[in-house]
A protein has these predicted regions:
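Short acidic loop-to-helix transition motifs that present clustered carboxylates
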Residues: 33-35
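Short, compositionally biased
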Residues: 165-174
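Short, Lys/Arg- and Gly-enriched loop/turn segments at beta-strand edges
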Residues: 159-165
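His/Asp/Glu-enriched, well-ordered alpha-helical/loop segment
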Residues: 4-26, 30-31, 40, 47-159, ...
Length: 185
């Protein structure tokens, strides 16, 4: 989570890459406090930044982040835009609280720091193709194309208009491996 921990993991992964380049695909979970140097290292090494936008629930004024990190460090958390613009691969997930991926997309597109907000498309891509890549499943999951699993949801409304309301959209249908497993239509 913290900047020192991220640096320590980057050091270890970079050592591993020197010993056996290309042998592994690494990721770091909870990349919440990456500084500029760490973001640059993530981009250069191809290490995936696995982050949980729903953690921004704690980012509000007088929230958990501010109570534990202080205002200055809180302002440096969850730098999604900086990471994406630097070429870092993003993988989004929930980490168990709250689990709803639409809430996480909402958090990524309405982040308290306007400079770190992603577009709906970028956030959805991090939850789908980015997560599949991080889990070594990009050949089966994360996109809808011939030869991949047909796992997807149909939403009641467009998540793009308005993006700020995405967490209020209901799921109309869920399809897993091409079979409808939930249908609220």
């Amino acid at each position: 989570n913290g900047d020192a921990a991220i640096d320590a993991v980057l050091d270890a992964y970079e050592t591993d890459a020197v010993d056996d380049p290309g042998a592994a695909r690494h990721r770091i979970e909870h990349v919440e406090l990456a500084d500029d140097a760490a973001i640059e290292r993530l981009a250069e090494t191809g290490i995936v930044a696995s982050v949980q936008p729903n953690f921004l629930k704690w980012a509000g004024e007088d929230g958990l982040y501010e109570a534990r990190l202080g205002a200055a460090r809180t302002a440096r958390t969850n730098r999604y835009r900086d990471m994406l613009d630097a070429g870092v691969r993003l993988a989004f997930g929930s980490d168990g609280m709250p689990m709803d991926p639409l809430y996480g997309v909402h958090c990524a597109v309405t982040a308290p720091a306007a400079s770190q907000r992603l577009t709906v498309t970028e956030a959805l891509r991090a939850y789908t193709a980015g997560a599949a890549y991080a889990g070594f499943d990009e050949d089966r999951l994360g996109t809808l194309e011939r030869g991949t699993c047909a796992d997807f949801v149909v939403l009641e409304e467009s998540p793009w208009d308005p993006a700020a309301a995405i967490c209020d959209i209901d799921v109309a249908m869920t399809v897993v491996d091409g079979a409808v497993v939930y249908d609220a239509r």
